[in-house]
Amino acid sequence: MERKVFSKDGQELRTIDLDDGVFNIDVSYGSIYNAINNELANLRVGTASTKTRAEVRGSSKKPWKQKGTGRARVGTRRNPVWVGGGIALGPKPRDYSYKLPKKVKRLAFKSVLSLCASVDDRLKVVENFTIDSGKTKELALIIKNFIKHNGRTVILLGNDDQMIKRAGKNIRDLKILSFNRLRVVDLFYTKNLIALESAINGLNELYVK
């Protein structure tokens, strides 16, 4: 599968081969769904915590005698029914993370890359560049040449270029990611995917096996 390579000014330069096994497979929406759920679960902190009737402050003495007062029977002021009492069945700190099978993860990445490249043409391949000044304005002018849809934009780098990342910090709805540190959720929800040549070559090597 061939794709046009553009200069940072938006001019056509040449073509690049996208491996069909990475960028042109039948999209598995099930694997994408499982991968996104896994990524979001792994991000959860899981620190929500409430006190049970055993942990809440208060006396365990019976407020009044069992019978003869006309009031409802109560055993303790820490009763979950009472204001200030313990919480019944409330959340406790827990780890929500879990492992996803490697084959499912790989299939999810290939599927979402194919979705971007083949199905709705979100992918634009751009020659390698850097932002020596680290200025936001310079990067914003480059991005403007390739934005096809309003919304989230992802730039894929072939390396960890700190100057490009610095330039993109103040641009709304923009994420700058290295090709080997991707998340399916970022690619699935992006409207525009701008990939540097080095990132495409890296993805071809990483997922072609």
UniProtKB/Swiss-Prot annotation:
Source taxon at top rank? Bacteria
Tell me the keywords, alphabetical order. Answer: Ribonucleoprotein, Ribosomal protein, RNA-binding, rRNA-binding
**Pfam families referenced in this protein's UniProt entry, alphabetically:** Ribosomal_L4
List the GO terms this entry assigns under cellular component, sorted alphabetically: ribonucleoprotein complex; ribosome
Q: Which SUPFAM superfamilies match?
A: Ribosomal protein L4
Molecular function GO labels: rRNA binding; structural constituent of ribosome
Which family would the database say this protein is a member of?
Belongs to the universal ribosomal protein uL4 family.
The record describes its quaternary structure and partners as:
Part of the 50S ribosomal subunit.
**Protein task:** One of the primary rRNA binding proteins, this protein initially binds near the 5'-end of the 23S rRNA. It is important during the early stages of 50S assembly. It makes multiple contacts with different domains of the 23S rRNA in the assembled 50S subunit and ribosome.
What this protein is called in its record is Large ribosomal subunit protein uL4
Q: Which gene encodes it?
A: rplD
